């Protein structure tokens, strides 16, 4: 069974082809800067790199360029050879509680909730519509970042704002990185020999975007991101949790204008706002001689530690603390700082294992630690492919 995974943005298409029997990637690539004179398409397969440099007008042209690369690399001759195509969708709102086969009603619902994710869902829709034209007889499946968090109880996802306003306008905590949290938790449960529906964990997806998730009996019961990915942990350029009155104050004194709020909170804040760099590698490298870099690092780790304590309290029993994402997988200094002084919770990492150059899934806790501390590289594309295959198989039963 071969599944193609598409992640279509406003000006890009990321793609990966999987053989599901072995769960291996046959090819991966990117169409970027769609609509620009510098647009191009790149594919990696069989240890080779294939590239097309030409003007790519829109998503239709982008998919044609992808098809050309598949043909040139002899990995796929036509999309009709596929068993399914899985599409990543950032926001499913309150309309979707599981991955779905795409039909007109699904497309209409995604269009209706696009105001909740104006930067992402329109690009996803463009990719879906054009891919369906190119492969009419292949089943298409949508996999939502928000679905894993639909198991949160109302007292966890509801904001303490006027109830009727929130209900009418679908204002609530949705959470994101759900595909990543689900994948790494499944892998961790398998690694520890625990049935997933009995597995409790605190999952930390730490990258330029960052979120924490409390998982109880294999289900998300709370997560740090909210209506948008802005809430929660400090991120590369996003503020995370803050007092909303700060924005009101800055508007009142004329420092901010209404049309500058989004850019201020999403692009100019976080690590970048504190020390001028959004890259944790640069922050760590500058810490010794730069007080603001040191402050940014300490603020980031402190915020994560607060969420660990909070989620420990609501879970009661924690089988594993999981690190994933670019920072979670590759920044031992950050992991060490986050886990320092958590021995009273049963979290105790081994210094040598934490700083080891070993890669892949691994335990980094001390022998006898009550809670296993794991590094699990995320693979959202594979999880989307697995979900796509599952939905297609269930439809044929």
Curated annotation (Swiss-Prot):
Note on how the cofactor is bound: Mg(2+). Can also accept Mn(2+).
Cofactor(s) the record lists: Mg(2+); Mn(2+)
SUPFAM superfamilies reported in the protein's UniProt record: Actin-like ATPase domain
Gene3D superfamilies noted in UniProt: 3.30.420.40
GO terms of biological process kind: acetate metabolic process; acetyl-CoA biosynthetic process
Pfam families the UniProt entry points to: Acetate_kinase
Recorded metabolic or biological pathway in which this protein acts: Metabolic intermediate biosynthesis; acetyl-CoA biosynthesis; acetyl-CoA from acetate: step 1/2
Cross-referenced PROSITE patterns: ACETATE_KINASE_1 (PS01075), ACETATE_KINASE_2 (PS01076)
Residues the entry annotates as binding Mg(2+): 7, 380
Location relative to the cell: Cytoplasm
InterPro entries given in the database record: Ac/propionate_kinase, Aliphatic_acid_kin_short-chain, Aliphatic_acid_kinase_CS, ATPase_NBD
Keywords recorded for this protein, A-Z: ATP-binding, Cytoplasm, Kinase, Magnesium, Metal-binding, Nucleotide-binding, Transferase
Marked site positions, Transition state stabilizer: 177, 238
Cited CDD domains: ASKHA_NBD_AcK_PK (cd24010)
EC number(s) from the headed UniProt entry: 2.7.2.1
GO CC annotations on file: cytoplasm
GO molecular function, one term: ATP binding
Binding site for substrate: 88
Family assignment from sequence similarity: Belongs to the acetokinase family.
Subunit (UniProt): Homodimer.
Cited NCBIfam families: ackA
Listed name of the protein: Acetate kinase
Organism: Campylobacter concisus (strain 13826)
Gene: ackA
């Amino acid at each position: 069974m071969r599944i193609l995974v598409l992640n279509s943005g406003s000006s890009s298409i990321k793609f990966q082809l999987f053989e599901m029997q072995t769960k291996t990637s046959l090819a991966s690539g990117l169409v970027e800067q769609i609509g620009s004179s510098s647009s191009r398409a790149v594919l990696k397969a069989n240890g080779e790199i294939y590239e097309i440099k030409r003007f790519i007008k829109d998503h239709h042209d982008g998919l044609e360029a992808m098809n050309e690369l598949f043909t040139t690399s002899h990995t796929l001759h036509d999309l009709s050879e596929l068993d399914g195509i899985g599409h990543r969708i950032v926001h499913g709102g309150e309309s979707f509680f599981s991955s779905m086969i795409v039909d007109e009603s699904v497309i209409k619902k995604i269009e209706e909730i696009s105001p909740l994710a104006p930067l992402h869902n329109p690009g996803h829709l463009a990719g879906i519509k054009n891919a369906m034209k190119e492969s009419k007889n292949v089943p298409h499946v949508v996999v939502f970042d928000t679905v894993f968090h639909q198991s949160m109880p109302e007292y966890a996802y509801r904001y303490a704002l006027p109830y009727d306003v929130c209900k009418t306008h679908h204002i609530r905590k949705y959470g994101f990185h759900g595909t990543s949290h689900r994948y790494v938790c499944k892998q961790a449960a398998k690694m520890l020999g625990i049935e997933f529906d009995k597995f409790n964990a605190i999952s930390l997806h730490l990258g330029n975007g960052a979120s924490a998730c409390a998982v109880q009996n294999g289900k998300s019961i709370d997560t740090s991101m909210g209506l948008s990915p802005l809430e929660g942990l400090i991120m590369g350029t996003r503020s995370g949790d803050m007092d909303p009155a700060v924005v009101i104050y800055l508007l009142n004194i004329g420092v901010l204008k209404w049309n500058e709020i989004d850019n201020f909170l999403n692009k100019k804040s976080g690590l970048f706002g504190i020390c001028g760099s959004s890259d944790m590698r640069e922050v760590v490298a500058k810490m010794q001689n730069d007080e603001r870099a040191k402050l940014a690092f300490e603020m980031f780790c402190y915020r994560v530690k607060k969420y660990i304590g909070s989620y420990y309290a609501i879970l009661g029993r924690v089988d594993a603390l999981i690190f994933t994402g670019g920072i979670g997988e590759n920044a031992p200094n950050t992991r060490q700082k986050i886990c320092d002084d958590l021995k009273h919770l049963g979290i105790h990492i081994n210094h040598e294992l934490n700083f080891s150059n070993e890669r892949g899934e691994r335990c980094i806790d001390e022998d006898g630690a009550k809670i296993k501390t794991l590094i699990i590289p995320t693979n959202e594309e594979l999880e989307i492919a697995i979900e796509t295959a599952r939905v297609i198989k269930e439809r044929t039963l």
